[in-house]
Amino acid sequence: MQTESSSHHRNLEALDFLSLVQGINQEDALLHARVASEASHIAALCELVFSRLQAGGRLFYMGAGTSGRLGIVDASECPPTYGVPFDKVIGIIAGGDGAIRKAVEFAEDDWDQGILDLEEFGVNEKDVVIGIAASGRTPYVIGALRACRERGIATGGVVCNKESQMRAVCDVCVEVETGPEFVTGSTRMKA
């Protein structure tokens, strides 16, 4: 899995701040072409979401850790930016709202909790659920998406590795190969 592989940058603690900033910028510069290579999947996911919203459904984001927080941020910005009601785009994070500010260890490993969290909102076949996971293998997210597909609920995924496990439980999956992080394993940086 590329996001978890060793960084190309060594001895970070010995570098000055300018070198650190330049190294991070070099890594980030690689992403534009990689995101562009997924344009058709990104467009397909947008079409899926649009069709569900047009039909009266809602958009749910599911994630753990930073991925869950990013879904919550986007859901929070949609009402003021696009004028949609606050209950139209909903972000859900493993571990509940307390995990927004403080990590809830091992919440991401629960295969069954994701669908239970969605059920609290009355998720149904009009809705679309997008899982967000840098690794593409987070049990909380995959379990929720699998349960949604079994119930006829549209699913999508946003992943930072190719050929992820999430692809198997998504109607549309965007898989951007972000590569190793500047700080090995720190997927909140680039992924």
Short names for language-model regions:
Residues 1-34, 38:
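Cofactor-/ligand-binding subdomain signature composed of acidic, glycine-rich
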Residues 60-191:
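Glycine-rich phosphate-binding loops that contact phosphosugars or nucleotide phosphates
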